[in-house]
Amino acid sequence: MTATLRRAGVTTQLVTDHPHLFETGGENYHTEFTAWDYQRGHEGDTWKTRPDPSWAGAPSFGRGHTLYDNSRGWFRDEADFPGPRTMTAAASWLRDHAPFHRDAGVPWLLFVDEFDPHEPFDTPEPWASRYDPEWDASVDGPHLIWPPYTGSGVGSGAISERQGRQIRAQYGAKLSMIDHWLGRVLDQLDAGNWWDDTVVIVCTDHGHYLGERDAWGKPGIPLFEPLLHTPLFISWPGVSVPGSTVDALTTNVDLHATLCEAFGVDAPTRAHGTSLRPLLDGSATSVREWALAGVWGREVHVLDRTRKYARAPRGDNAPLSMWSNRWSTMPLHSFPELRMPPPDDRATLDRMPGSKIPVIRQPFVPGDLLPFWAHAERMETLCFDLAEDPGEERNLVGTPAEAELDDLLRTALLEIDAPSDQLERLGLT
């Protein structure tokens, strides 16, 4: 997207504290921006080599977090945390740079990739005690800022019910703190009179389980609504109606096409998104019939306006392949102990849909070591009518609804030119 806009003469600025963008596997897409600003120290950012000795860290439930402990000691007050620094930098860019581009008649994109409210759910007071004032550090220990990743937290004994309440409270604290600092950006939009000629989009990539179904974090289970259903806010002067709500199926893929339309730029022909402008101006009530979601090697999900279908792979989860244009950029280093196999002599060069050159294709068979993100505590086929059953309690597998969504999933995969292996793996051939 940024490369397309930059070629069209749009100034693009990235402001972020998202550490994964700058790791091996991040693909260096930040270099496509006109300029980028990285605020250091979130989660596992390799920023500092030693911690403040007065900071002992917090319980990690078996996962080491030395990198964050090293960074955390350098946050002297709330404004030093990565989230507040990111929002401050974004507001400063709006104040100090955006007016120059407006006066010069140069369109601009400010992309604020804020990692919060991601774990660690670490905040200073008064946020830390705001939603659980009864937590006594002298008795209960430090605030719990690292949630476990499990499909059975309390049930398995990974955490107690009391610890679960504390984790939810710390998530709320992190959410409230970053919401407060996001207000600084919105205040600057007010101060610069930007609302009349600026499209503002607020979205996120995924949710976080906080005890729903006793799931915590982002474990290897199907994508239920708390993780999959994300918020989206758009203000488009002269197009959207302030304060209105649109009941339509959208996906983050659509934001690419939406931004291209906002800037008057043609989207690449192979892009899968659809502009959301017709929903905003009222000229349409729907822009897509389906949306896809999933995690490599696990279930593939398809949704229409009212239903969701998670189809698990059949039998031995084969054929399964991983495709990469540069295996050396795969995130091997992120969690080397959590299984990321190198390619072997079965790897071949093959073409992915839309690729102009062959890429590495590594097949996997039952018994192979799989990447850590493909780990599944359980895989199952699920079908829900979200309009009638928003809590996803009644599995409609075996009903006519499943047959209809089988057909829809097959149609969607064919429409995006998914490899034939994907349909075979899911038993859709």
Language model features with spans:
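Active-site regions of oxyanion-processing enzymes, predominantly non-cytosolic
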Residues: E23-D37, S71, R76-S138, D190-V199, ...
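A long, amphipathic alpha-helix that forms part
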Residues: F81-R102, S138, S152-T198, A262, ...
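Histidine-centered active-site microenvironments of extracellular/periplasmic hydrolases
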Residues: P120-P133, Q188-D247, T251
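A short beta-strand-to-alpha-helix junction
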Residues: R165-M177, P219-T230, S240-A257, F263-T274
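C-terminal, low-complexity/hydrophilic appendages and adjacent surface loops
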Residues: F224-E225, V295-V397
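Short catalytic/ligand-binding loop motif for oxyanion handling, primarily in non-cytosolic enzymes
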Residues: Q13-L14, H20-G26, G44-W47, D116-T123, ...
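Polar, surface-exposed loop/tail segments
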Residues: L21, G83, M87, D196-T198, ...
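Catalytic-site neighborhoods of secreted/periplasmic enzymes
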Residues: M1-R76, V295
